[in-house]
């Protein structure tokens, strides 16, 4: 069996070497010639997998180590009898950590109390849904817009217009859909962006084209009160340099790039592959993940809650480093800038998730205990 895979997928040998030969390619370089003799194709979001890539090939299973599937032509897969799997939720926790880190940075810049903000989450799937649970757990006011879930479940969802009118912070977590009943391409267009509240914060860690980047650039030029945090870009790896300069935080599509999330994505497509072949799983992710480099953090019961929140979140992730690295990589030379974008992702430093963090409390502190629980960290006793 020949397995063609994106070279940046972690643990390929650990999970797939037992099935046959693995050939690795840069994700953007996987083409019809490299896929022609493959039985299995393993990709990330940078590889468009469609008829043009696979027609005439031997590929019968496609796995993408991502939550999103907008780079896969699922209609063609159905017609061609190609089995496929994505990795829903694999990096959800990493994205939540990214959003929390961004909120802390913006709060420091603006001198605002995060407890007093109103949060709007657009898209409440694996990522957005987890973010909503964390924000609710912290006791913050959250409004949620998800027309797909609203139609199937009912519940306390609101319209996008309500989010724009009432929320100080808007975090986008939708898939990219160009058509259908609920398209998300340019969900925030010029008109929608113009209705942002004074002093609004906009975070996009979903897909670049969910926001009209040209319209956002023009808005930020006109309104200094609005802060934008962009991890995803229209046309990436090429980036609108002026827009990046106008963003308060700008990063190269790494919001979900925790070590745990990336390895979890590989594990999920391995599990789907085993189910497709009707074989038992021989490898477990729990046996491969390294121990958390930070053993534990201890907090005094009288610690300031705002300080404690920042300490815990930044113990695992602070977006300011990624922002600085990204800005240093930006170049007027398009080819150089595109290459730098991919290199930052390829050589991304090890980053763990807050759920692997152990936190000890010295003394009785119900508010801090609730915060630790909401963040998903492990509350442990202090001797």
Swiss-Prot record:
Residues that bind substrate: 45, 66, 257
Gene Ontology MF terms: 4-phosphoerythronate dehydrogenase activity; NAD binding; protein dimerization activity
Annotated active site: 207, 236, 253 (proton donor)
Record-level GO cellular component terms: cytosol
EC number(s) per entry: 1.1.1.290
Reactions accelerated catalytically: 4-phospho-D-erythronate + NAD(+) = (R)-3-hydroxy-2-oxo-4-phosphooxybutanoate + NADH + H(+)
SUPFAM superfamilies referenced in this protein's UniProt entry, alphabetically: Formate/glycerate dehydrogenase catalytic domain-like, NAD(P)-binding Rossmann-fold domains
Pfam families membership: 2-Hacid_dh (PF00389), 2-Hacid_dh_C (PF02826), DUF3410 (PF11890)
Keywords carried by this UniProt record: Cytoplasm, NAD, Oxidoreductase, Pyridoxine biosynthesis
Residues that bind NAD(+): 146, 174, 205-207, 231, 256
Keyword NAD: yes
Major localisation: cytoplasm
Pathway, per record: Cofactor biosynthesis; pyridoxine 5'-phosphate biosynthesis; pyridoxine 5'-phosphate from D-erythrose 4-phosphate: step 2/5
Acyltransferase in keyword set: no
PANTHER family assigned: FORMATE DEHYDROGENASE 1 (PTHR42938:SF9)
The family this protein is said to belong to: Belongs to the D-isomer specific 2-hydroxyacid dehydrogenase family. PdxB subfamily.
Role this protein plays: Catalyzes the oxidation of erythronate-4-phosphate to 3-hydroxy-2-oxo-4-phosphonooxybutanoate.
Description of how the protein assembles with itself and partners: Homodimer.
UniProt protein name: Erythronate-4-phosphate dehydrogenase
Organism, as annotated: Pseudomonas entomophila (strain L48)
